Amino acid sequence: MKRSVLLLTWTFLAFVACSSGAEETKTAPTDKVELKDPPLKVGYSIPFGGDKFELKNLKYAKSVGVDYVEVSGMSAFIDDQRNFKLSELEIKERLKWAKKNADEAGIKIWSIHMPFGANLDLSLVNETNRRDVVAKQGRLVELLEILEPQIILFHPSYYLGLNERDLRKAQLIKSAKELNEVVKSINATMVIENLLGPELLKDENRERPLLRTVQETIEIMNRLPNSIGSAVDMNHIKNPEELILAMGSRMKSVHIADGTGKHENHYFPCSVKGQNDWTLILAALDKAGYRGPFMYESAYDDEKDLMVCYKMLYNNYLNASY
Ligand SMILES: [Zn+2]
């Protein structure tokens, strides 16, 4: 779809949604726009720390077509030195508060974005440190059972040193197998997200994280148990449809955002700032049989834009297909 058409359509739909509510986007003042409902539910990533889990905010999101959330911001519970910041009792109380509000608003917790960083890296070479990462991440997963998430999402690594990639892969696989057992014990599915890596080197002393290309993601996923799934982030790789098709039914979750494949842009897909071809992406999601939420991890102005944008992308895809 031409980008100018996308922008024009988005401007029009956003105007209709603003002036008369998201439900009425089907009727244009002068011309009739028949928009078909898209197949997936809509979700978006919200941090634990802010006010997004307050009941009124969750209710608002639900009222404009959001059914799921991914919970991020786990740094509210654990610091970058792997120390829990709160007592377990306090963590449980906060999680219960969030779950109660989500239930009352009718919002389901689809996924948890687990914490990441140099000292929370599943692929650490030092065994004492790696075991401590697994222990702390595992304990956090057990506490997060309160939220009844379906998906627990991990980054495969942080930045790597030079020429240690193979060793890091082996360490990641060890950690993932161990954490997968904890994730299974709370009736959730573990997924590992592809990360940004347009070139191997981040700078002269560091390599980009693991799962930076389609080929590397395939290689590592093939070495992991089948019960561990893949999460495809649309702003971490150029032409994400290629990764979606390579993962197929192994893909259990997504991060919807636009970008250039070179930076952590997390642009809103209808902003026309990124380079993704959403028709190709939606076709790939269809072909892969993905049935989870259309989970935004992107900038947005207002929650009401999330469903409107997905609906527009979906109708563009339908019109391009036939
Ligand atoms: Zn992501």
Task: Identify the residue ranges that each predicted region occupies.
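N-terminal pre-domain/capping segments
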Residues: 4, 18-146, 166, 177, ...
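Acidic/histidine-rich catalytic cores of soluble enzymes
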Residues: 36-40, 177-275
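Hydrophobic faces of well-ordered beta-strands that scaffold small-molecule active sites
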Residues: 40-46, 69-71, 109-114, 152-154, ...
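Active-site-proximal loop/turn and secondary-structure-junction residues that shape catalytic pockets
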Residues: 48-50, 73-75, 116-118, 156-160, ...
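Short, electropositive alpha-helical surface patch
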Residues: 123-141, 163-176, 205-222, 245-253, ...
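Active-site groove signature of glycoside hydrolases
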Residues: 144-165, 186-201, 295-296
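Active-site clefts of carbohydrate-active enzymes
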Residues: 258-269, 290-305
